[in-house]
Each structure stands twice: as C-alpha cells, then as structure tokens.
C-alpha cells in the first residue's frame, strides 16, 4: 500500500495592505526550498515565480520577493485580489503543492467558502462575488452581487447603481483596498474619449459609484464643494479635520476617510481645468467664497443639492431613514442646464447691471409718503385704462408673471408659509439643533445659492420634477346659484372690474418686473380696490390670484431689502451646523465600528483559543487510542500462546486417560488369571505346585507395573 503524500497548509487573514502584497508565514518557508535557501534580501531568483490556483482551476502567476527575512507575494497578487473580490477580514486557505504552486480557497466573513462565478472572458471581467453580509440597521443577511466590470460606460454605471448595487461591508464603509483595487480600472475609465460628454455632475456621480463611496461621504463632499465653490483643495483641507479626530482611537479606522478623500480629490481634478482652481492659498479662497459668491466662471452645470440627493438615493449605504431622504428630496431645486462661456458673460453683465440698478435705487430712494402717493396715482391710472392685452386670456398673461430669478412659487396660503418661514428663522436664532431644523437649514442653504445667482434656475424647456412644478393660475367664473338679479349684476360688475384691474396690474409687472414701485402699486391696489369686492373674492381662483400678487410684491421687497453679508453669515452658520452634525454622525459610526471590530477581534481570539484546546484534546485522545491499540495487540499475542498451551494440556490429559483405561484392562486380565490360578489350586494337589512362589512372583510383577504406571502419571508436566 502506497503512502499518501501530505500537503502543507497555512491560513492568512486579509488585514492591512493585503491588496498590494501578502506575506508568507516564516514558519512555512521550510516547506519551500527555493525560498528557504535564499539568504539575500532582494528579489529572489527568476525561478522563484509561483502560481495561485482556485477551486475552479483558474491560475494567476505571481512573483515572490524577500525583504528583511520576510517573503511576500508581490507581482500578480493585486490581480488575484481583484479577480476574487477579496475584502477586509476575509481569509484564505493556502495549500502548497511543490514547484511554487499554491492551491487557494477564499472564505468570506460568514466563515463559508466564497462562491466566485467567473465570466466568459478571462480578461477584463471582474468575477461576480456573491457573499453574505450584515448591515447595521438592516433587517438581516442578504445576498449581494458585486459589479461585473470596473470600466463600464456612464449609462451602465448609473443603471447598476439604480438596480440596487450596494457596497456591503460589515462597517458600512469602503475599505482602503476597495478604492485602491479599482484605481487602475478607474484611470482607464476616465481616460476614455467616448461617453464623457455628460455634465460634470454626472461625471462625479460616476466617480462616486466606481469608488463605492457611501452616502455620508457624498453628502459631506457635495455640500462642501458648493460651499467652497468647487475648490477641491479647500474641501480637502476641511476634511483633514476628520483625520485627526481624538474620538477615533483605532488608527486604521481613522485613515479610512483620509485615504478615501485623497482618491476622490485626485480623480475629481480630471474634470476641472487648472483655471477652475484658485491660485490663492486655501485660507484666501475660503475667505473669497464667503465674500463673493459668484460662480459664473465655474463650469458647474447642475444644482448640486439635487445631484447630492440623487447620489444619496443611489448609494444607500448608511443608516438613514426613508422619511428624511424623501423630505430632503422634496425641497430640492431643479437641475440647471449646461453653461457656456457666452452665458457666463451674460450672467456677469446681468449681475453688474443689477448692482448698478441697486446702487441707483438706493441713491434715489424716496420717502415712504411719496412712494405711497406715486403708487396711488399709478393705480388710479390703471383703473381708468380699460384696454385689453393682446393675449386676451388672463390665464396666458398670468403664466408670464415671473420674479427676478425664476418663476414664482404660488400657493393657496402664502401668509401661512410666510409664518412658517418666520418661525424657522426664530428657531435658527434660538439655536435649535433638532433634526428637522437641520434639514430645513440645508434646504434654505440650497435655495439661497439659487436666489443669490450662484446656481441658476432651469429654463422653461427643461423638464421640471413633479415635486417642483408650480400651480398654474387660472380664472373660471362659475355661475352663482340662488342669486337675485341685483346681486348678479353687482357680481358681474365686480368681476369685470377685477379682471380689468388684474390685466393692468399685469401690464405694470410686465413693464417694471423688479421695481419697488411695482410692489407698492400691487399692495395699494389689493388693499384699496380688490378687497372692496367681497362677492368677487368668494371665488377660490380669485383668491389664489390675489395671493399670488401679494406674494410677488413681498418677493420684490425682499429682493430690494436683501442683505448679502447677513445672508452669507447666516448660511455659513447653518452650513457649519449641518456639517458639524454630519461629522458627529460619522464619528458615532466610526466609534460603533471600532467597538464592533474590538468585539469581533475578542470573539476571534476566544474561538481560536477554544479551537487550540480542542485540537490538543483530540491529539491526546489519538495518542491514548494508539497506546490502547498497541496493548491490545500484545494481549492478543498472549491469548494465542495460552490457547496453544491449553491445547497441549488437553492432549496430555487425553493420553493419561487412555493409560488409565489400559491399566484397568491389564488389572482385569490379572484378576482373571488369579481366579484361574485359584481354581487350579483348588483342583490340584497342594504339594505339587509351589503356589506361594507363583503368587509372590505375580504380585511382584504387578507391583512393578503399578510403579511404572505411577511414575508415568506423576511425571506429567504442564508448560
């Protein structure tokens, strides 16, 4: 029987910089003669090239390097990690088959062997890693499929993210090797000249999805990019604060955010030319971002608040409730179109014109009494004029009413909304930090950027989301029921006056859309004329039109009374509070992850010690069984010897029995002879035969035979 050759094994847990190289245990090097005999710390001979093979038979060539007495798998190892989707805290079982050939079995975090489904092409495809994981705050374990390629097109990546692709790791954060492992594929993807015509917001979405950045990362990075006007260096400096948080005790967890944002910053530079960055230092750029919030020279095509919410929905990796996400998404502003240099110059000229008009209005600002008199005279002129507009439709005219920076957001109860806004400002002044207030602050911040001109609103040709569509104004008179003729005539007169007044107010708004006198005219007309028509104002459409006029007047006054510096400080404070809250949340997540890591480490140590004890007990039992088997073999030999002795004794005993029977037969013969002799003696003469001599001879013979028989019986020996 041939002896089965025993293979040697070792195990490695994926921790540290395992994506770049992997160390072979020093105790295992004695089984690799090519490496063990090499004593120089340098590249091993060319023959020290190995091969890794998985359970499916696929192989990867690797090279071994020796440094300070340690041997590492280097060239080719990164490809093996990438193709097998290895993640942190997973482990590999290596079996050495001689000739630098290793059989490798990967095991996931659930202690089960990973199932790697390879694609049809051996190159350019990433195997689909199906693994089981746990996620904080989720319902339980579920299977997730990783991406099939590192370099897909834009539509493929967005389709993959919308189909529910999630990075699933026990810490809910991507590890260092996940970003590092996809760098080569990302560089190749960004160097393509194909579908890179999309706007930069979509390109950033591609970067985020390829780097597997989670939701908190997207929110922080997008919010700070808006705040610092796309100055990536300024954003990176603020993220340096996260690197040195004293609350994060684990150095490895602390470096995760550090490493991740360095990669994001480096990749985002590919989308912005050098002119987009500020030549001044970071502190000066930060100061400028607070003093001059102009983005006309920046190539920004999309409102980042909307893009941030879209990215957040695609990268659902953190434990945020669906209510908060929906509430945040409902306040988002529409996406902005792609800007061109011509539009940028127009925006600059528009801003300069608005500034000059504002200065002139401040210089020529009349007294309140003169403004009211002028508004009353203008309203009287509007009431005396009865010419119809060219459109002939109040619905079409009312659609053209727009404020200075976009369409008017109309509602049925503007005063109620104004009260809510005032309440929100009071809550901000009182420094309330609850979650709803923080979300409201974030929404107001995004709206402030739109109002200040940093982010332009979308034109009429753009598709507006359903949640942001404006309620259209229309006026349809319904015939009144059970009304006497006099009231009907009065109602018709009031309706005609209402329509004529509204039409001429539309003309004033059309000629002077952002003039402060227009707001005064609207206020005076509504208070002194329209409020008198009680019967007409019972109609709901008329109420909505009046509310829209008052809202438009209020917005014009707000625009003229707008203080940029105060709003900058207010929005800066709100954004800082929002970012501090998110940073605290990140710290909390890191702390919980660190506790989980410590717990997992302690459990692993306990399990390893228990396994070691069980192995010792098993070896002891095996030794005892081996000793018992040896003693059993000895006992079997002794039993066989005893059986042979018993058989010999039985044969001797049979012989003695046969001898006794023979002696009995002889004695019987002698007795018969003795009887015959006695008969003869009685019949013959006594004197003729010496009877006594005969008897004595006979007795002597018998005595001798008995002695011989006795000696043979007494000389029986037992061995």
From Swiss-Prot:
UniProt-recorded name of the protein: B3 domain-containing protein Os03g0120900
Hydrolase recorded as keyword: no
Stretches the record annotates as Disordered: 328-381, 412-443
Keyword Hydrolase carried by entry: no
Keywords: DNA-binding, Nucleus, Transcription, Transcription regulation
One Pfam family named in its UniProt record: B3
GO MF term set: DNA binding
Annotated Polar residues bias: 416-430
Comp. bias regions, Basic and acidic residues: 351-366
Organism, as annotated: Oryza sativa subsp. japonica (Rice)
CDD domains according to UniProt: B3_DNA (cd10017)
Subcellular locations according to the entry: Nucleus
Cellular component aspect of the GO annotation: nucleus
Location of the DNA-binding region in this protein: 7-110
């Amino acid at each position: 029987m041939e002896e089965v050759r025993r293979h040697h094994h070792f195990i490695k847990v994926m921790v540290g910089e395992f994506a770049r190289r992997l160390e072979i245990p020093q105790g295992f090097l004695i089984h690799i003669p090519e490496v063990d005999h090499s004593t120089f710390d340098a590249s091993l001979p060319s023959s020290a090239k190995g091969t890794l093979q998985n359970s499916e038979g696929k192989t990867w060539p690797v090279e071994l390097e020796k440094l300070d007495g340690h041997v590492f798998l280097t060239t080719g190892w990164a490809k093996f990690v990438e193709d097998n989707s290895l993640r942190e805290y997973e482990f590999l079982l290596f079996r050495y088959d001689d000739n630098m050939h290793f059989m490798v079995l990967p095991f996931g975090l659930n202690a089960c062997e990973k199932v790697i489904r390879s694609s049809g092409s051996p190159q350019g495809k990433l195997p689909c890693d199906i693994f089981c994981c746990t996620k904080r705050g989720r319902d339980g374990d579920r299977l997730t499929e990783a991406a099939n390629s590192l370099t897909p097109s834009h539509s493929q990546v967005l389709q993959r993210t919308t189909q529910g692709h999630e990075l699933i790791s026990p810490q809910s954060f991507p590890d260092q090797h996940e970003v590092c492992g996809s760098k080569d594929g990302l560089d190749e993807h960004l160097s393509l000249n194909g579908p890179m015509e999309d706007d930069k917001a979509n390109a950033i979405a591609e970067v985020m999805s390829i780097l597997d950045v989670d939701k908190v990362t997207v929110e922080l990075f997008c919010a700070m990019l808006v705040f610092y006007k796309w100055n990536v260096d300024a954003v990176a400096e603020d993220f340096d604060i996260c690197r040195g948080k004293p609350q994060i005790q684990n150095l490895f967890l602390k470096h995760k955010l550090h490493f991740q944002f360095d990669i994001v910053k480096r990749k985002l530079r590919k989308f912005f030319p050098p002119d987009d960055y500020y030549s001044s230092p970071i502190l000066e750029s930060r100061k400028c971002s607070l003093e001059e919030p102009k983005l006309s020279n920046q190539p920004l095509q999309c409102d980042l608040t909307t893009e941030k919410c879209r990215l957040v929905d695609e990268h659902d990796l953190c434990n945020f409730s669906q209510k908060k996400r929906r509430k945040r998404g409902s306040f988002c502003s529409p996406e902005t179109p792609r800007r061109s240099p011509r539009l940028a110059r127009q925006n600059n000229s528009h801003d300069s014109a608005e500034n000059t008009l504002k200065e002139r209005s401040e210089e020529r600002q009349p007294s309140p009494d003169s403004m009211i008199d002028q508004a009353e005279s203008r309203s009287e002129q509007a009431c005396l004029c009865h010419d119809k507009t060219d459109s002939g439709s109040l619905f079409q005219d009312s659609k053209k009413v727009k404020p200075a920076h976009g369409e008017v957001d109309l509602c049925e109860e503007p005063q109620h909304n104004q009260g809510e806004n005032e309440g929100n400002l009071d809550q901000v002044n009182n420094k309330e930090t609850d979650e709803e207030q923080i979300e409201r602050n974030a929404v107001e911040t995004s709206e402030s950027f739109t109002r200040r001109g940093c982010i332009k609103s979308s034109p009429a040709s753009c598709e507006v989301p359903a949640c942001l569509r404006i309620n259209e104004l229309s006026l349809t008179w319904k015939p009144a029921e059970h009304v006497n003729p006099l009231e009907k005539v009065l109602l018709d007169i009031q309706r005609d006056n209402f329509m004529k007044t509204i039409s001429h107010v539309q003309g004033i708004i059309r000629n002077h859309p952002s003039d402060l006198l227009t707001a005064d005219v609207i206020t005076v007309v509504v208070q002194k004329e329209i409020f008198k028509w009680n019967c007409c104002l019972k109609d709901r459409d008329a109420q909505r039109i009046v509310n829209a006029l008052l809202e438009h007047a209020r917005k014009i006054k707000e625009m003229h009374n707008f203080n940029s510096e105060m709003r900058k400080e207010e929005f800066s404070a709100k954004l800082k509070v929002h970012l501090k809250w998110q940073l605290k949340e990140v710290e909390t997540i890191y702390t919980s992850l660190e506790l989980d890591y410590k717990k997992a480490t302690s459990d692993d140590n306990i399990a390893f010690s228990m396994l070691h004890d069980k192995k010792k007990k098993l070896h002891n039992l095996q030794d005892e069984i081996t000793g018992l088997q040896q003693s059993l073999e000895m006992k079997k030999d002794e039993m066989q010897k005893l059986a042979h002795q018993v058989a010999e004794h039985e044969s001797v005993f049979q012989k003695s029995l046969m001898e006794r029977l023979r002696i009995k037969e002889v004695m019987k013969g002698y007795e018969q002879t003795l009887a015959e002799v006695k008969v003869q003696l009685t019949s013959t003469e006594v004197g003729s035969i010496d009877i006594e001599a005969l008897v004595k001879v006979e007795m002597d013979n018998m005595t001798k035979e008995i002695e011989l028989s006795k000696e043979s019986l007494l000389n029986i020996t037992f061995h």
